Amino acid sequence: MSAISRSALAVDFVGGAVGYKLRSGAARSHALLKATGVSANRPLHVIDATAGLGRDSFLLASMGATVTLIERSPQVHALLAQGLEAARAESDEIAAIVARMTLIHGDARALLPTLQADVVTVDPMHPARTKTALVKQEMRLLREMVGADPDVADLMQAALVARCGRVVLKWPLRAEPLAGIRKPSYQIAGKTVRYDVFVNPRAPAEEALPRADDLALFRF
């Protein structure tokens, strides 16, 4: 990726669409909240297994959730760290949200067996659309930086056996179901994506494994 492209990709939790949703209260009706079960009265612990630009994690944290962000790309991890640091210095309100976000650099497939949470979310690089003009420039830049996610089925398998109450897969609205995994318990549709929700019948054993938010070493 060129230096120009790299500089065009940034993590911003204050301005743009993220800031607007926070200021306007529009985030409260987001389909992701319904899929995860997160609300102001139910501040769950969520592991975002594919943090990306961190927007979904910030949305969940803004509603009171404690969120652990796992990102395996060194470049994207660095962008997230910069974005979190900048957001923390913006205002007391934003700093309080960021304080509920813990960033870890690593492969979620290896980390998930060592952690527990109420919810695990997975938002892989979605299959490329045939009409590339429909793909936002930002997502094209991100795809150039990290490439595709050919191992998404393996990641989902790791998530489905993790110590959590449910797994939420973010997937294109009209795309075929992800092959190689079991059928979701139910689906929640958004405007352009859907959330495939996999409910685990057993709650995680609280004493068996550390909760990811206890890993203060990785907190930003």
Swiss-Prot record:
Gene3D superfamilies: Vaccinia Virus protein VP39 (3.40.50.150). GO terms for cellular component: cytoplasm. Keywords: Cytoplasm, Methyltransferase, rRNA processing, S-adenosyl-L-methionine, Transferase. S-adenosyl-L-methionine binds at residues 55-56, 71-72, 123. Its EC number is 2.1.1.242. It is an enzyme of class 2 (transferase). One of its GO terms (molecular function) is rRNA (guanine-N2-)-methyltransferase activity. It catalyses: guanosine(1516) in 16S rRNA + S-adenosyl-L-methionine = N(2)-methylguanosine(1516) in 16S rRNA + S-adenosyl-L-homocysteine + H(+). InterPro entries: 16SrRNA_methylTrfase_J, SAM-dependent_MTases_sf. It is found in: Cytoplasm. Pfam families: SAM_MT. PANTHER family: RIBOSOMAL RNA SMALL SUBUNIT METHYLTRANSFERASE J. Specifically methylates the guanosine in position 1516 of 16S rRNA. Belongs to the methyltransferase superfamily. RsmJ family. This is Ribosomal RNA small subunit methyltransferase J. The gene is rsmJ.
